[in-house]
Amino acid sequence: ITVLRPSGGSARVLGLDVVEQANEVRQAIGYVPQERAIDRFLTGREHLQLLASLYHIPKDKAAARIDEVLKLVNLEHKADEVARSYSGGMKRKLDIACGLIPDPRVLFMDEPTLGLDVESRLKIWEHIRQLKARGITVLLTTNYLDEADQLCDRIAIIDSGRVKAIGSPNELKSGLGGDIVTLTLASGDLDKVEALAQAVKGQTGVKAVSTKQNVLDIRVASPEAALPAILGAVTARGCRLEFVDYHRPRLDDVFLAHTGRRIKED
């Protein structure tokens, strides 16, 4: 933001135009990149001191600000150790601390938990929740739909550069309507999948059907009402079932409905 001129359209951050008021926008935002911007030979504190000087923060205020963000991301005990001794989760915490040095009102985070183990991911989630509680607006990009569901007040589903849907997690999921019935056919019945899908589409209460290899995802108004007819279609076509499941709509179902594919395929 503010580095490259947009090829079209307009954007505002906190009511500020990113082209006409670029300096004011830069003063209001922080950024945590996807690729770690860590120098392994510097300590955590030295990283923050360098950034504080680049932001022209006076030394007396910088020291207090550095201590504050180190405490916020729980890195005080490692602040004076070189970054090469940090674990992956600690390096990500340092990235977040760097993004917080200018005391931003809006923090942009690009894939904040990419490549982290489960424990480290959960810790980063907790730090993001703390930022929200402090009144910081966090805008994050993620391919982890459970992460978006857990952390976000509003979600935009973007496909090929276009916003396909936007709303709260509950709004997006309830907007699909009904439940999802998933049928997994025996691998030897791949040639029957499309014919079965067409037959199921004609059943009462079936809203939509999508297929992926030997799996059918069927959106229905009521699983209890639709399942007998669906299973009847399976039997009539001599298909062998390996697994049957149904669940309330999840964000991956929302993504599938708006893009035609599941996010794990990308």
Each language-model region and where it sits:
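A generic structural signal for secondary-structure junctions
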Residues: 14, 30, 56, 95, ...
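A short linear hydrophobic-aromatic micro-motif
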Residues: 74, 205-209, 240-245
